[in-house]
Amino acid sequence: MTIILKPGEVTLSELEAIYFNGEISKLHHDTHLVIERGAQRIAEIVAGSEPVYGINTGFGKLASIKIDADKVTVLQRNLILSHCCGVGDPLAENIVRLIMSLKLISLGRGASGVRLELVNLLENMLEKGVIPVIPEKGSVGASGDLAPLAHMAAVMMGEGEAFFQNIRMSGALALEKAGLSPIILEAKEGLALINGTQTSTALALAGLFRAYRALCGGLLAGALTTDATMGSTAPFHPDIHILRGHYGQIAVSKTLEKLVEDSEIRAAHLRGDERVQDPYCIRCQPQVMGACFDILLAAAKTLIIEANAVTDNPLILRNGEVVSGGNFHAEPVAFAADQIALALCEIGSISQRRIALMVDPAVSYGLPAFLAHNAGLNSGFMIAEVTAAALMSENKQMAYPASVDSTPTSANQEDHVSMACHGARRLLVMSENLFTLIGIETLIATQGIEYRAPLKTSTLLQSVMECLRKNIASLKEDRYLAPDLHQVHILVREGHLLSVLPETIFPSLSFQ
């Protein structure tokens, strides 16, 4: 399936399909005229004598140096090669595809002045699977994601490296094998390719999509734990949350209420339970997870605006005027990434507390210590709980806001930067940790519910448990647990456990 991108109207679901499903993307044909109009305006400037930043001048601190018309192609080539300073491991293919798609959207607005030929090459690279090797580190998220995007642009010139059919090779060879020809960049085209927030935005979007999946997984795990510990569902009553009024809290309380509906375990202790209230990790799930959902929604709103934005500099306005500005500064993306990091941290924090509740016989309401059969001889989930604590702590350290850590660059010309790129990139690590943490809770809670037999959990939760047990057996006696943790990580990360439930049971991230 090919996703047709209409700049200004691209949706979260379209970008999610590119990220998760590897869908090919290309611009709507309606963009061609405005792209060509912008390119014509750049050609007029090059033919004239007036110096215009980025078109016939140097860059950054060297912006005052005028470049002759016969040197503009050399200028653009030198710009790309000199900016290929990324370090670290290559970004994953789905991230790079998202970066390239976001760059298409920005160029498709016609304010960057590139030729249609350049846009076509980018589209063809996506279609044929020429994936530039983009090192993960090197951007401070202002004046655009210069280094990572330069590595993308280098392949378009026949330089750098790319993956083709899962083999790493030179950019020139990758283009040749795909039946494509490198492009000679004309005036401003190199700058248009690297001046933008597409790397930071792609990473933040990936973090958002993964955080939402973790939120849903956390709600599911929390519902399982509520039944495993014979917790009260009264705190999920909708009127409680309507009285407070927060959208996210109301939405997730409905999810939790539906997940535990018709549970025999819950019905068995509606009366005669000496506990008056549950610990906060059970009772305050709607408040905590609702707040997490709210900030994910706020981040989503920022990121979909940014995904449809022109973040180049200078820009060609509708009247043909070329104006320098600062749309390349990724502060909105940095803030969104910091918000997502908070949600990832808190989803994990409350999950870890629920794990601790279940493994402690003093507070688990009848569950054996560490959910172990013949405790003492067997240790059960004792160290799985420690692993969860380690992952929670690691995420807490990474939740420190990246956006507050500006430093001057480029001889103090670019003296305030966003740090959006690594602020967004850490979300991938945090979400990986969180998928495992939620998986550990899901494993323990499932075993806890099995201890409540012959009482059954809800119909929905029973279907989730059946899916889990098709992949991971119940822990009857101690065994090598690492494969179980790896398997449950995959089940949570890939959304397999969520897939057995009605899609409508979870609140939607889409607001469009």
Swiss-Prot record:
Signal peptide limits: none
Gene Ontology molecular functions: histidine ammonia-lyase activity
Class of enzymatic activity (EC top level): lyase
5-imidazolinone (Ala-Gly) cross-link, chain position(s): 142-144
Localization terms from the record: Cytoplasm
Sites bearing 2,3-didehydroalanine (Ser), chain numbering: 143
Modification note: Contains an active site 4-methylidene-imidazol-5-one (MIO), which is formed autocatalytically by cyclization and dehydration of residues Ala-Ser-Gly.
Keyword Zinc-finger: no
EC number: 4.3.1.3
UniProt pathway: Amino-acid degradation; L-histidine degradation into L-glutamate; N-formimidoyl-L-glutamate from L-histidine: step 1/3
Tree of life domain: Bacteria
UniProt keyword annotations, A-Z: Cytoplasm, Histidine metabolism, Lyase
GO biological process terms, semicolon-separated: L-histidine catabolic process to glutamate and formamide; L-histidine catabolic process to glutamate and formate
UniProt keyword Membrane, yes or no: no
InterPro entries registered for this protein in UniProt: Aromatic_Lyase, Fumarase/histidase_N, HutH, L-Aspartase-like, Phe/His_NH3-lyase_AS
Pfam families in UniProt: Lyase_aromatic
Catalytic activity: L-histidine = trans-urocanate + NH4(+)
Main location: cytoplasm
A GO term from the CC aspect: cytoplasm
Family: Belongs to the PAL/histidase family.
Name this protein carries in UniProt: Histidine ammonia-lyase
Species per Swiss-Prot/TrEMBL record: Bartonella tribocorum (strain CIP 105476 / IBS 506)
